[in-house]
Amino acid sequence: MKTVLVILGFICVLGLVISLSKGKEDDPLKNHKFTVVKTEAEWRKILTPEQYKVTRQRSTELACSGAYWKNHEKGIYKCVCCKLPLFDSKTKFESGTGWPSFYKAIHKDAILEIPDDSFGMSRTEILCSRCGAHLGHVFDDGPRPTGLRYCLNSVALDFEKDAK
């Protein structure tokens, strides 16, 4: 019995070591340099508590609670942290999810896509490429022409209405 427990313990420790080392090797942000970098204290000073929780701690706002999920005005959606233009209202659509949804980013380099295996799900997380703010996730169930659904947190966005 003692031998069985020792073997099981060894297997558990080995599995933990392998999973921890795998995460470091596969870091998708390893070679990315964010151009806007602030300390946690600096982010807390410029963001509301909810903005900080979502963008810096990778949380998610409640569905149907954000300012932009029903916004139909024309304009540009920007990162709330660094003001980088991210999405154009021309690519926004009603997804029925309770979060603002877009089928295309304003520019492919505006966002970063990284694997997110949290909560037992396999998803793709979306970050601002300039400051690393968590924006939301992208799914492959969107409309044409891309078939993508960028599902974003309103609180991670600023909206700049068209001047017209």
Language-model features: locations:
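Bacterial Sec-dependent signal peptides at the C-terminal "C-region" and cleavage site
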Residues: K2-N31
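Short helix/turn-capping signatures at newly exposed starts of structured segments
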Residues: G23-I46
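A short Gly-Trp-Pro
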Residues: T35, R44-K78, L84-K164
